[in-house]
Amino acid sequence: MRLTRPSLVSAASIAAVAALALSACGGGDSATEASASSSAASSSRLVVATTVSPITSIVSAVAGDNVTIEGIVPEGTNSHTFEPEPQAAELLNKADLIFINGLKLEDPTLQLAEANKKEGAEIVELGTIVLPESEYIYDFSFPEEDGKPNPHLWTDPGYAVTYADIVRQKLTERDPANAAEYQANFEAFKAEADKLAAAVSADQASVPQGQLKLVTYHDAYAYFAKNFGWEVVGAIQPSSFDEPTPAEVTGLIEQIRSQGVPTIFGSEVFPSAVLEAIAAETGVRYEDSLRDDDLPGAPGEAQHSLLELLRYNYRTMISGLGGQPTQLDALVFERTVPDTAFYPQ
């Protein structure tokens, strides 16, 4: 599995791109402008920009083929440290709607969007809308003193449905002619997400009592764990997203031993020699195949979706903790909406 390195763009670059975008809008060949104006007038198709692949997948599931959807954050990238290429400003300048997670996850992309969005465009921070501050989760990877709560709501299928409903509302406001289709697509997505939640609830009951405990590379399951009755013991990736200090490693080893954690979970997207060494030191099983935000399959394939990603990760965790994921294995998603979104790789 590839490991995509984040690109870097400075605040000065953001300002320069914004200036270029403004000058491009105000100048240029009149024939070119007339052609562009004619092209825009001839098409009422919405243009939507998204950030991480789970959000792109949700938007696509609701929008169907009525909307042009393009993601910004490549799959397999650490979304917390990702900074967009300056050319992302061009997409953001064309978009009618810009869907991001919010909760401080994509601040550089948000800054670029605010500097370059066209008049009338809307930036929709899904997580910030959904989660009241009283329900923010702060922990070892997201300490409260840093002011950035854990942003990973979409790993819980219930929150994924709430995201999808907001997407439906925003698309309907912009494109009321297709409101019935957006509603039908949302209801189909909700039905599949509800089946997934039911399968997880059934299968986690097969995990030996007291073993629904998570130690992961990336701290992505806090809201899922809270709502499904799991315990997040720790994560190897600290708030700085650098390698953990020796003291942090020692503390995590002590937690694993004292709480009887049976398995620790790494990521096939972000291999961790430190987590592997912790497993060897504690003698617990090491399962290194969680996919984080990297959707399975290739864009356009049926398995390339958020729900399939969640099914895969839930299955990996339940089996790794000694359970039997029989309901997850038997689950068949009835995908009727084509995914025509662009997912950067």
Locations of regions flagged by a protein language model:
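Extracytoplasmic metal-acquisition and chelation regions
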Residues: 2-14, 21-345
